[in-house]
């Protein structure tokens, strides 16, 4: 079979990813990626017809979206076992996996409950046409994850050849147990916002207040800044044993000339960062996911609708705080069109089916959010979200940029 050399070398190098080996799942199935079709007004960049891309505004443009590009599903039982194997004591929302010619995120989702309650069948058919009982499956892979799936005759053929060549499943990343409450912006995220002078002042005020508190001998704010927001009174004193450790033992060390000089030098660097746009906002980075409900619908041959509507995302973090709307950014960002503003879904259905995905951001399958976020997919990409009122106020409506590019074969 013919391959594009560059792609083949990239697939081969997946085995070199820094990762932690884990046990093989007890039952694996490979299914096709779901696809949705919708219509949207877009800025179309067509690079297929000439050397110089043609840019046009297209009304009601037909978009075909691979709504689960780069993601698969793992059962809660597998998530628990893998977490224990990498010495984590919580149930992760997802893990980034590797194996021979295989990469992507596996998110924790109860697809067996879906089979019982929604599909009302235990049988699914894989990409090779073989039937499987979903109750015997722990890991669902998609064709976008298993790059050379059509070079094998079955999942057993793939696993057997992987084992014989020394390959195994491994994890490169695991989702956090909790998301941060505060995140820093950067110049890319800020430079295109339309802000009045008062808005700019209010946007940077929390950062200025933090610096002012530290310079004015606020012991707790200083320790939080130096050692991180997760520091508590019960935190065990541990390395590095430096002036910050001394402050944790005795808060009066803040009055020591050497200690205070170290803090001032640190703050000078922080002030330089602020000038470059590194300012604090309420928000965090989280891993992106497509709508796993669409994948379940697709693999059981049901109409693909998903649970999220156009313009919606699911985020337990924001939903649990009563937030209705957030702005989303993905680095690298190049233009204002790369910013999304989304509504937070909150209903019984999403809360039930996404209950294990509490630290990820789930995109809907019915808009161009992936294109807007500079070609995001779901194999480990992250999004920074914030509910900051001045950031939201400074975002102006723009059309998504959709780029048409030629795709080479495998």
Regions found by a protein language model. Name each.
Residues 1-371, 392-393, 410:
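Conserved small-residue
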Residues 367, 373-410:
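Conserved catalytic alpha/beta cores of large enzymes that bind or transform nucleotide phosphates
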């Amino acid at each position: 079979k013919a391959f594009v050399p560059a792609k083949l070398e990239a697939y081969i190098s997946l085995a070199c990813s820094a990762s932690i080996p884990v046990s093989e799942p007890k039952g694996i199935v490979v299914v096709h990626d779901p696809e949705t079709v919708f219509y949207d007004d877009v800025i179309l960049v067509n690079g297929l017809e000439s050397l110089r891309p043609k840019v046009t505004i297209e009304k009601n443009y037909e978009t075909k979206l691979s709504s689960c590009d780069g993601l698969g599903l793992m059962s809660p039982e597998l998530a628990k076992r893998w977490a224990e194997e990498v010495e984590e004591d919580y149930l992760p929302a997802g893990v980034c996996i590797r194996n021979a010619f295989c990469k992507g995120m596996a998110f924790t989702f109860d697809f067996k409950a879906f089979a019982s309650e929604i599909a009302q069948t235990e049988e699914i058919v894989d990409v090779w046409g073989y039937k499987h009982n979903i109750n015997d499956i722990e890991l669902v892979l998609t064709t976008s994850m298993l790059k050379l799936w059509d070079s094998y005759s079955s999942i057993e053929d793939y696993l057997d050849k992987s084992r014989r060549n020394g390959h195994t499943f491994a994890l490169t990343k695991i989702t956090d147990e909790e998301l941060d409450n505060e995140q820093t912006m950067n110049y890319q995220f800020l430079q295109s916002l339309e802000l009045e002078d008062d808005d700019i002042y209010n946007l940077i005020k929390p950062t200025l207040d933090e610096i002012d508190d530290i310079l004015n001998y606020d012991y707790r704010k200083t320790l939080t800044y130096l050692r991180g927001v997760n520091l508590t009174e019960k935190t065990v004193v541990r390395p590095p044993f430096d002036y910050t450790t001394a402050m944790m033992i005795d808060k009066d060390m803040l009055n020591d000339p050497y200690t205070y000089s170290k803090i001032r030098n640190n703050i000078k660097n922080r002030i330089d960062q602020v000038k470059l746009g590194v300012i604090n906002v309420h928000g965090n980075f989280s891993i992106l996911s497509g709508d796993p409900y669409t994948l379940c619908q697709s693999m059981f041959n049901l109409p693909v609708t998903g649970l999220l509507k156009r313009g919606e995302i699911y985020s337990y973090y924001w939903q649990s705080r009563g937030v209705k709307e957030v702005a989303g950014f993905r680095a690298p960002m190049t233009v204002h069109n790369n910013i999304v503003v989304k509504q937070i879904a909150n209903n019984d259905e999403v809360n039930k089916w996404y209950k294990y995905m509490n630290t990820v951001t789930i995109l809907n399958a019915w808009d161009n959010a992936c294109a807007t976020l500079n070609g995001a997919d779901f194999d480990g990409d992250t999004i920074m979200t914030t509910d900051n009122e001045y950031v939201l106020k400074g975002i102006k409506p723009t059309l998504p940029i959709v780029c048409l590019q030629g795709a080479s074969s495998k």
